[in-house]
Design a protein with these regions (language model features):
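Residues that define the transmembrane beta-barrel architecture of outer-membrane proteins
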Residues: 2, 9, 79-85, 146-152, ...
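Repeated loop/turn-to-beta-strand initiation elements of outer-membrane beta-barrel proteins
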Residues: 12-15, 95-100, 162-167, 249-253, ...
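Transmembrane beta-strands of outer-membrane beta-barrel pores
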Residues: 10-12, 21-25, 91-93, 105-111, ...
């Protein structure tokens, strides 16, 4: 991670601007690996009816097959890139109206992906081979999550020193907010793990139509709309208020309300019409705080 910034002062206006970049290629996550797939025997037995109720039934091997079992372990395959600009400006206090103004905000871009192979298959029937097929191995980084946003926060603070009263109003605007996913080759594997011996083999894409590898073909199970990047959400406003009363020089009581107008608009996806997202859904809350100084 690295960042560079500048502080400035023009008259009573003070501020700072910072640009940063942050990246990692070995972040923590839990994931399956080639070593966490195990080929085991899958035995089915039939039971003969005992001669009497006190005897145990006699078991005989009915069938024996090979299947794959898997589990996940802690790994360092999480990767991301992040960059952005942050700013904070204090416009100072206008004494004639006993009010100060401040503005801060940020622009951010974020991308994350798994820096390792992914493992996927699907069942093709009720038989052992259909229920426990080979495991498809897909190329690293074939799915990446993206997000970006541009936000500003205007803070207005008005105080009346004579009665120890302070009102702070904050207007937060998300000018741009976007989340979408990009995909690489997530339909035909580049390798596979055999259910018969647990070994990893390179996969010849020309064999994807063979019955043995039907469970590795994801083309018919993926929605083509996933390849269309989602558009940005429109701007949204959230207003917060805080009222503080100072009682003498040892007590302070505050009342606050976040998203005071309960603005929670609904946004409809352009890629998946009929899919709605309620914005600002968890930002409305209010309360009171009491602080006492003990000297």
């Amino acid at each position: 991670k690295w960042e560079v910034g500048v502080d400035f002062k023009i008259g009573q206006v003070r501020g700072s601007v910072t640009y940063y970049e942050d990246k990692t290629r070995n972040g923590y996550m839990t994931s399956a690996t080639f070593d966490t797939f195990k080929c085991v025997d899958y035995n089915q037995y039939s039971a003969a009816k005992p001669a009497n109720e006190t005897d145990m039934p006699e078991l005989s091997l009915k069938s024996s097959d090979k299947i794959l079992l898997q589990y996940s372990i802690p790994t360092n395959y999480f990767a991301y890139n992040s960059r952005g600009v942050e700013f904070d400006i204090d416009f100072g206090r206008i004494n004639s109206i006993r009010t100060s103004f401040g503005l801060n905000g940020s622009w951010t871009q974020y991308k994350s992906w798994k820096n390792y192979y992914t493992f996927t298959n699907h069942t093709t029937g009720s038989s052992v081979a259909g229920s426990y097929p080979h495991m498809g191995v897909f190329e690293p980084g074939n799915k990446a999550e993206h997000s970006s946003s541009t936000t500003t926060n205007l803070r207005i603070t008005h105080n009346i020193p004579r009665i120890g009263f302070v009102v702070t109003l904050t207007a937060s605007v998300k000018w741009k907010e976007r989340e979408y996913t990009t995909y690489g080759n997530d339909s035909i594997p580049v390798k596979y793990i055999s259910r018969l011996d647990g070994q990893v083999y390179d996969f010849d894409a020309s064999r994807i139509g063979e019955e043995e590898f039907q469970a590795l073909d994801m083309r018919g199970r993926l929605d083509a709309r996933r390849l269309i990047p989602e558009s940005s959400m429109p701007p949204i406003l959230c207003i917060n208020i805080n009222l503080t009363k100072e009682i003498r020089n040892f007590m302070r009581i505050s009342f606050f309300a976040n998203n005071m107008f309960r603005s929670t608009p609904i946004w409809e996806s352009k890629v998946y019409p009929g899919k709605y997202t309620r914005r600002n859904a968890k930002t409305f809350f209010f309360g009171a705080a009491l602080s006492v100084k003990i000297r």
